[in-house]
């Protein structure tokens, strides 16, 4: 069983889960006078963005700090980082197969490069919004819909960002595609809009 976005759970619900987290834990359904005991192979997982600490950054509004007693019942806590560049590129191409050409693969690789830059910028405090693999996928899909990579980028990511950070974002874009998003859209030799 996977509790997705576990730290967004309501505290009254979280206490019901606490008993299940115990070794050989069980769930009691009082209204049905029933006790549910898990199969020996049963495993419980949870995903969070805050590692149970609540929204300390302002990025995950609606999350709750998880009770320390409940956190203590989780035997293993793992932090997952972003995918490798090649893995993320392969996933985007598998989801948007129109990009599975030489030019398309180069285009997606540059998109992922920009996403990597945004993540580094976020870590360094230059950006307050990070580009997730989901955003890169939206950008690729919107590039096909609008037949315009630059517009698709603005609609998929840049418009979500603080305007005071647009200069940094425009610089990242120029590095990856050779296009100044604030100009008339004329490209340098590095970039081109994807054309099927």
What are the residue ranges of the model-derived segments?
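C-terminal regulatory/interaction module of P-loop NTP-utilizing enzymes
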Residues: 1-196
């Amino acid at each position: 069983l996977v509790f997705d976005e576990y730290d967004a759970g309501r505290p009254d619900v979280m206490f019901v889960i606490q008993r299940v987290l115990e070794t050989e834990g069980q769930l009691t359904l009082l209204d049905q006078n029933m006790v549910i005991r898990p199969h020996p192979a049963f495993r419980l997982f949870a995903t969070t963005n805050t590692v149970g600490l609540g929204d300390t950054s302002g990025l995950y509004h609606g999350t709750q700090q998880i009770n320390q007693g409940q956190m203590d019942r989780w035997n293993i806590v793992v932090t997952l980082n972003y995918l490798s560049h090649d893995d993320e590129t392969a996933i985007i191409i598998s989801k948007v197969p129109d990009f599975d050409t030489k030019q398309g693969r180069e285009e997606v690789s540059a998109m992922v490069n920009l996403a990597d830059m945004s993540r580094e910028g976020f870590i360094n405090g230059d950006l307050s919004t990070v580009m997730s693999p989901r955003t890169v996928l939206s950008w690729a899909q919107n590039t096909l819909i609008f037949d315009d990579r630059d517009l698709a980028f603005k609609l998929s990511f840049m418009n979500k960002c603080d305007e005071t950070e647009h200069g940094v974002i425009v610089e990242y874009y120029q590095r990856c595609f050779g296009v100044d998003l604030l100009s008339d859209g004329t490209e340098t030799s590095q970039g081109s809009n994807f054309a099927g």
